[in-house]
Design a protein with these regions (language model features):
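PIN/NYN-family metal-dependent endoribonuclease catalytic core
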Residues: 6, 21-51
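Alpha-helix capping/helix-boundary segments
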Residues: 10-11, 42, 111-112
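Residues at secondary-structure transition points
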Residues: 20, 37, 60, 84, ...
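Membrane interface segments of multi-pass transport proteins and intramembrane proteases
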Residues: 55-58
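Active-site neighborhoods of divalent-metal-dependent phosphate/nucleic-acid chemistry enzymes
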Residues: 71-104
Length: 138
């Protein structure tokens, strides 16, 4: 099983039907060999950010994403805390990746460059993941 953590920014981009993020997320949920890992803190961030007024997502789209999180993710309870001074709010994603023994953390956030020495997880952009994994797998 290939375990993946997806940064909130990638999820938001996919909700707006941005082609590459949406394609990558659909690939992850459709392939039995892949597991999308989240924690309660990550789920809370996903739902809070997607519901922000500035994004103006319809109730139907928000419901679609809530259902996707419910049915196509694996919830874990990280029992570790990571001090990530670069951006402490991103620590929850690193904790999820570490506790869930994720193979990949997909992000567009440059702050995670410094995190490479904190986790064994491969930190990769959505376009790199598409090129290295999705395009070769399909």
């Amino acid at each position: 099983m290939i375990k993946v953590v997806v940064d909130t920014g990638i999820t938001v981009s996919a909700a707006f039907r941005d082609r590459t993020p949406e394609e990558v997320i659909l690939f992850i949920v459709e392939q039995e060999e892949f597991e999308w890992i989240i924690s309660p803190a990550v789920l809370e961030e996903y739902t809070e950010v997607l519901a922000r007024k500035k994004f103006n997502l319809s109730p139907e789209i928000l419901q679609k994403w809530r259902e996707m999180f419910e049915h196509f993710t694996t919830m874990i309870e990280p029992d570790i805390e990571i001090d990530f001074p670069r951006d402490q709010k991103d620590a929850k994603l690193l904790e999820c990746a570490l506790a869930g023994e994720a193979d990949y953390l997909i992000t567009g956030d440059k702050d995670f460059t410094e995190a490479r020495k904190l986790v064994q997880t491969t930190i990769i952009s959505v376009s790199q993941f598409k090129q290295l994994i999705v395009d070769k797998w399909s």
